């Protein structure tokens, strides 16, 4: 299932980009996003104009009914993003903490683009989510995309605040 999320941040692109890539951004997301219980940066590597960041995020809600699929019933995932400062674009993948036999049934990847406009910086996130589960897959995809949008909305609010000050 394809998704697209846009946010306008009323600040220059360079300021928004710095806020997006700032160390500690994931920790702040855990404090502010209602759905996130924990978030931390696992790895960060900068080379030339590229910044690669791997983050760990864990949802507040447990899903005991999904313990067959999700490790410990706790919805958690790693987010890998490779951002190119020269093009203001990134590629991301989301790797959920699923039992090994279920990992190939979940795919989420996409792009993250910052574009300067006359009103500020437009942040566009486009992605594809596929959950290969008979009958319920599309319904789960819609629910997950809704949650992804909620997390990106919380992140947009954090970016707006960071860019104001």
Language-model-derived ranges and their functions:
Residues 1, 73-75, 106:
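Residue-level preference for beta-strand/loop junctions
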Residues 42-46, 107, 151-155:
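Alpha-helix boundary/capping detector
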Residues 51-53, 77-82, 91-146:
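Beta-strand/loop substructures that line and gate deep hydrophobic ligand-binding cavities in soluble
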Residues 1-65:
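Hydrophobic ligand-binding cavity/cleft-lining segments
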Residues 31-33, 97, 141, 164:
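Sparse recognition of residues in long alpha-helices and their boundaries
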Residues 9-11, 85-87, 116-118:
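A generic beta-sheet turn/junction motif
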Residues 84-86, 137-165:
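A conserved amphipathic terminal alpha-helix motif
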Residues 40-96:
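Glycine-rich portal/gate segments that line the openings of hydrophobic small-molecule binding cavities
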């Amino acid at each position: 299932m394809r998704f697209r999320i846009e946010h306008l941040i009323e600040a220059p692109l360079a300021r928004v980009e710095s806020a997006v890539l700032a160390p500690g951004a994931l920790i702040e997301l855990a404090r502010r996003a209602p759905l996130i219980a924990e978030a931390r940066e696992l790895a960060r590597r900068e080379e030339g104009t590229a910044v690669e960041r791997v983050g760990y995020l864990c949802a507040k809600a447990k899903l005991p009914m999904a313990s067959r699929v999700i490790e410990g019933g706790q919805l958690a995932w790693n987010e890998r993003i490779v951002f190119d400062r020269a093009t203001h674009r990134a590629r991301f993948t989301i790797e959920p903490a699923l039992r090994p036999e279920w990992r190939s049934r979940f795919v989420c990847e996409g792009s993250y683009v910052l574009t300067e406009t006359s009103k500020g910086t437009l942040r566009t996130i486009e992605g594809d989510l596929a959950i290969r589960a008979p009958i319920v897959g599309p319904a789960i995809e819609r629910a997950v995309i809704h949650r992804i949008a909620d997390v990106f909305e919380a992140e947009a609010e954090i970016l707006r605040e960071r860019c104001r000050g």
